[in-house]
């Protein structure tokens, strides 16, 4: 909205044309989202407390988590509000990729909202059934993949790109839709599984979103894409604005979510943020780089899969508790130590992912 306004005003005063630069709008989107989060956050959290929208804690979880009972949850609605508003303010709304990102994120947030609401209504930690949750996620993910496939103007936009290996494109054709489904649903649920400690999920999300913004900017610029030998995807640069909004909103949320947390994002935020990261990675053709940079999300998910398979086959558990962050808590690690060490690992993985821009 602001972008369109400034472009109109540019005919009156050429100085307004400075807002056509993606890098400037990316920075402004980050700052806008951060300020909005910090300003709205206290009022939003107060409302959650007023209406007793509090976290339900599992009885079989770490004992230290019992004090979290009743902490305001569904804070992800704040993140969603800020991200979407900021994106609409600073993006080129004539770009269909912007709408795919916004609507997919909003849809996954809505699924998470229903899940959180049912937990509150039932006064336990069980929300939507697994079948209902994955069914709804599948509908949205297939729809998003289908739209992106229809929007693709050349084979590169639906081909698998291998990081660190130059000039390798694996055409997927219509299989791109199925591949996108797994990336979106997998990333969404991986972030959700990671969201079990104060600040644990939001910091890696911010780091990965920032890095994906760089990839999106490069892939949307024909000159940079050619120089760095990455796929050129026309229009993908607008995802830099979306990523800037994710970074700003995430940092603003962290202000209230850092240990000891004043609010939790709930499934409303975790499912939406995971889907948002996935959409940007798909648009920028960097799904495998997302797998690297989001290594913490991947390991957390694998720990759950390993735990379930092991228990069903042998009756024994590999970890003291899954996801993995609870295993370390059960070993006696303080919650902040677990979170910060996972953040450090994410810093390393994000740097590895970014290095793929040059190492080819």
From Swiss-Prot:
It comes from Acidithiobacillus ferrooxidans (strain ATCC 23270 / DSM 14882 / CIP 104768 / NCIMB 8455) (Ferrobacillus ferrooxidans (strain ATCC 23270)). Pathway: Cell wall biogenesis; peptidoglycan biosynthesis. HAMAP family: MraY. The lineage of its organism: Bacteria, Pseudomonadati, Pseudomonadota, Acidithiobacillia, Acidithiobacillales. The gene is mraY. InterPro entries: Glycosyl_transferase_4, PNAcMuramoyl-5peptid_Trfase, PNAcMuramoyl-5peptid_Trfase_CS. The keyword Magnesium applies. It is an enzyme of class 2 (transferase). It comes from the Bacteria. This is Phospho-N-acetylmuramoyl-pentapeptide-transferase. The chain crosses the membrane at residues 26-46, 70-90, 94-114, 136-156, 164-184, 199-219, 236-256, 263-283, 289-309, 339-359. It is found in: Cell inner membrane.
